[in-house]
């Protein structure tokens, strides 16, 4: 969907409300053709209709959402000037602390926990008058690539409910693809926004590390985690990106730098003269031929738009996966030590006779799932005396080499492109017992996390009726380049196929 609905909002009745873009929804609300309550009720009705099948949501706050929508309508009626996303419904990944809603991180160890404060991104969404529908399903503590690691059951892909939606932000992606919400917020540690975006036919963006606050984001890997948007269009993603970005003194890793002009870039749609580098290392064995064909067609479209396309080598990208699976579990081992049964969350075996260590052990055994335990053990081992330098230390050196690859590449080109994932969505259960095969789903996305730069996944086409994506990567704090290239390519691909890709998603 590439239409610019801001200037020409579609009135209710001519198009199903839940299928409107976020920009179109906001524009219709702003001029009174649609109320925020109507938009919210439409989303809630859609959730009631399809979410038993999709299982995108862990918690739906219907009362809170409708109250927020009424506030938007009342203030608009009073003549108050509202923001560009006022009244637009949104699904929130259940990894952000949210006052008034449970925050579980997809884990039994936090089941029923209600945080007393909002994450900064949640506060900014409320300030922007975005309507929070509820909390979306996810792999436990964001550890996974399929959303099968959720303690509360898997989410299903709206394109084929026998297949995974990707992960760890699979609930957020499925909610948008199933037209339960026009927008969703996810997190990306090694591809957890971009991979599900690709597998569900969406736009997903990992902003520059430090560009969006992590305060209130329950940490998996602190040097890699980043919040970002999932949407049906590049412009919608840009509007959400702009709403959550900016310096936050509550986050020590937040960078005090100007927010890139992502909305203007998304609407520019002119990439003549831009230099685009195709990453040589992301092709060949392990890549589905259909994925490679869709990627080649997208690259051809970039050439047709006037971009200068060249091949670029990033030789250390091939070491990204093993480096990531030492760094991320090491940080996870440290971060998840806070779940000790003493301060919040689950407590098992506290019979008045057991000591604190025994209670903690029983609680963590009962509360953490298999993948979380696997990564804690791996990280603890990598950080242990005698192994730190050989494993964690070496992985950090590889991380530096990958950052240097990016620096060298961006001296030659403005952006890099690759497939987002090696394959389309695979069947539920197909890789649960093969962790390495599961980890390979993030082969193309991990380098941007290790280097801290921004990256976007954009729908590139269908393979056997399933969506796949093209990834666009840019230098740190050049997030606007993603949107400039993404907006132009989205329009070209939609024109080429005669309609937005999501028009082909099967009805549920």
From Swiss-Prot:
Swiss-Prot/TrEMBL keywords: ATP-binding, Ligase, Nucleotide-binding, Protein biosynthesis
EC number: 6.3.5.7
GO molecular function: ATP binding; glutaminyl-tRNA synthase (glutamine-hydrolyzing) activity
Signal peptide segment: none
GO biological process, one term: translation
Gene Ontology CC: glutamyl-tRNA(Gln) amidotransferase complex
Catalytically driven reaction(s): L-glutamyl-tRNA(Gln) + L-glutamine + ATP + H2O = L-glutaminyl-tRNA(Gln) + L-glutamate + ADP + phosphate + H(+)
InterPro entries from the UniProt entry: Amidase (IPR000120), Amidase_CS (IPR020556), Amidase_dom (IPR023631), AS_sf (IPR036928), GatA (IPR004412)
Signal listed as a keyword: no
Catalytic site positions: 93 (charge relay system), 168 (charge relay system), 192 (acyl-ester intermediate)
Domain of life per record: Bacteria
Function, in words: Allows the formation of correctly charged Gln-tRNA(Gln) through the transamidation of misacylated Glu-tRNA(Gln) in organisms which lack glutaminyl-tRNA synthetase. The reaction takes place in the presence of glutamine and ATP through an activated gamma-phospho-Glu-tRNA(Gln).
Family membership: Belongs to the amidase family. GatA subfamily.
HAMAP family: GatA (MF_00120)
Protein name per the record: Glutamyl-tRNA(Gln) amidotransferase subunit A
Organism of derivation: Frankia casuarinae (strain DSM 45818 / CECT 9043 / HFP020203 / CcI3)
Gene (UniProt): gatA
């Amino acid at each position: 969907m590439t239409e610019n609905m801001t200037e020409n909002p579609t009135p209710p009745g001519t198009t199903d409300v839940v299928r409107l873009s976020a920009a179109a929804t906001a524009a219709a609300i702003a001029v009174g053709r649609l109320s925020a309550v109507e938009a919210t009720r439409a989303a809630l009705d859609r959730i009631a209709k399809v979410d038993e099948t999709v299982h995108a949501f862990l918690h739906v706050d219907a009362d809170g959402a409708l109250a927020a929508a009424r506030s938007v309508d009342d203030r608009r009626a009073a003549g108050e000037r509202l923001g560009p996303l006022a009244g637009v419904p949104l699904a929130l990944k259940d990894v952000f602390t949210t006052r008034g809603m449970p925050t579980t991180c997809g884990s039994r160890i936090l089941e029923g926990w209600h945080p007393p404060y909002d994450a900064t991104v949640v506060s900014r969404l409320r300030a922007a008058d975005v309507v929070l529908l509820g909390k979306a399903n996810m792999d436990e503590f964001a550890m996974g690539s399929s959303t099968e690691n959720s303690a509360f059951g898997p989410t299903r892909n709206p394109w084929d409910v026998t297949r995974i939606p990707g992960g760890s932000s699979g609930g957020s992606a499925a909610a948008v693809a199933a037209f339960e919400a026009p927008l969703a917020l996810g997190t990306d540690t090694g591809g957890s926004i971009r991979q599900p975006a690709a597998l569900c036919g969406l736009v997903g963006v990992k902003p520059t590390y430090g560009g969006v606050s992590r305060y209130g984001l329950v940490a998996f890997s602190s040097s890699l985690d980043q919040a970002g948007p999932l949407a049906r269009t590049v412009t919608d993603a840009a509007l959400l990106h702009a709403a959550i970005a900016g310096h936050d003194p509550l986050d020590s890793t937040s960078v005090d730098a100007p927010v890139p002009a992502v909305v203007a870039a998304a609407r520019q749609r002119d990439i003549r003269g831009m230099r685009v580098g195709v990453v040589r290392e992301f092709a060949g064995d392990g890549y589905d031929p259909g994925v490679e064909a869709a990627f080649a067609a997208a690259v051809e479209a970039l050439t047709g738009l006037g971009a200068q396309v060249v091949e670029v080598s990033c030789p250390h990208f091939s070491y990204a996966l093993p480096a990531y699976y030492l760094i991320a579990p090491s940080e996870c081992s440290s971060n998840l030590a806070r779940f000790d049964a003493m301060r919040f969350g689950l407590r098992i075996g506290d019979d008045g006779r057991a000591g604190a260590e025994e209670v903690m052990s029983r609680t963590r055994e009962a509360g953490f799932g298999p993948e979380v335990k696997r990564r804690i053990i791996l990280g603890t081992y990598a950080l242990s005396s005698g192994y730190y330098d050989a494993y964690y230390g070496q992985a950090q050196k590889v991380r530096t080499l990958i950052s240097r690859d990016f620096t060298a590449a961006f001296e030659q080109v403005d952006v890099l492109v690759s497939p987002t994932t090696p394959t389309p969505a695979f069947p539920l259960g197909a890789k649960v017992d093969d962790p390495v095969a599961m980890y390979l789903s993030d082969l193309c996305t991990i380098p941007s996390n290790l280097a801290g730069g921004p990256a976007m996944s954009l729908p590139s086409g269908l393979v056997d009726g399933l969506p796949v994506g093209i990834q666009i990567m840019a230098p740190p704090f050049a997030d606007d380049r993603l949107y400039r290239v993404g907006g132009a390519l989205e329009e070209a691909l939609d024109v080429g196929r005669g309609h937005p890709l999501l028009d082909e998603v099967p009805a549920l």
